[in-house]
């Protein structure tokens, strides 16, 4: 009888322990569902600074599940940000289908909270995800009006006050749809100049730094026009076919936006692409984005003209190359490789920080189904040529280990895959296998910063 009592007591104790363990596991799952940033335990072990100096970005493990992060390269861990100059934030990373995650990136410099957009397929959803990550607002010194407490209120304010300009590579909807949809909220009304307590960062901070006063805006209801930049064919398509009072209200005509048509192969100081005079711009000439020059290049995108934007820092000489859609044509003849090599010839290889380029399909996709897109084998052939075609050092550089290759426009995996892999995983594996030059492959995740 005594033995039976001991056995019953032991079984009861085991039952209680199992229930406690199960309860804690359920709480952990609940916490994971609710917490869209890093875990509370990790956050307690980290100190947070007041600016985005790159020292407080987290390991991929903090955001990605094991199924995802184990085939991503590190992109915003402390070691990657320590020596970085720029930070880019993916607002959308896929090509077509997923309307909440289409091609768009923000770019800024460490220490700045003014951003330029590179394509604009998805804007709202990417910014909403970004602004709700823990510590983003502290790291980038984002200040909101006192009433902006809801995610949608903060998303709207970030768009108004922190996104200055849009560089649009071509006019397909998966590259401009986000800009069109957010345009009703994408402006700062002049009454915000008097908001209390005053907001001294973003575009509001810029206006104050340039010495403007409330009385300077009496003839306009908007503090600053935002700029939409692209090749003439792109600008014409946006203005004629989208902001045309039929597909969408013509908001640029109300002073929301100003178009800038850029000529292929001509370099423009950013100070010439904003609605301020040169004397005013001298006050911020060494700050981002005014310290940057941009040179657009015409690309092939099947039967449409697309664009690469080459950004050069006028102070450090560092360069970043952004490619909108381009690649193997299916319906027309076009020297798509030659046009990309024209970009390579303008790059100083030791100054190159990053390349954004699409990889829409896996290697087994036939040319007849490409329609102006790229596969991993195409991309890595281009990387081989980058070392050959670019402006070299003496002695010449023999690898691309200092360059981040940010892969964009990956089409979702809607067909059967024998391994059950996402297209991101297939493409990452194929890029890695053909990476002869050591370029640092990044498969971006919506809203997660990448130091470059």
Swiss-Prot record:
Q: What is its main location?
A: secreted
InterPro entries xrefs: cAMP-PdiesteraseII_CS, Pdiesterase2, RibonucZ/Hydroxyglut_hydro
Its subcellular locations are: Secreted, Extracellular space; Cell surface
Task: Please name the GO terms of the biological process aspect recorded for this protein, alphabetically.
Answer: adenylate cyclase-inhibiting G protein-coupled receptor signaling pathway; aggregation involved in sorocarp development; cAMP catabolic process; extracellular regulation of signal transduction; negative regulation of glucose mediated signaling pathway; response to cAMP; response to catechin; response to differentiation-inducing factor 1
Q: Does the keyword Nucleotide-binding apply?
A: yes
PANTHER family the UniProt entry points to: 3',5'-CYCLIC-NUCLEOTIDE PHOSPHODIESTERASE 1
Q: What is this protein's function?
A: Phosphodiesterase which displays a preference for cAMP over cGMP. Involved in the degradation of extracellular cAMP. Maintains the responsiveness of cells to the chemoattractant cAMP during the aggregation phase of development.
Q: What is this protein called?
A: cAMP/cGMP-dependent 3',5'-cAMP/cGMP phosphodiesterase A
Q: Which organism does this sequence originate in? A: Dictyostelium discoideum
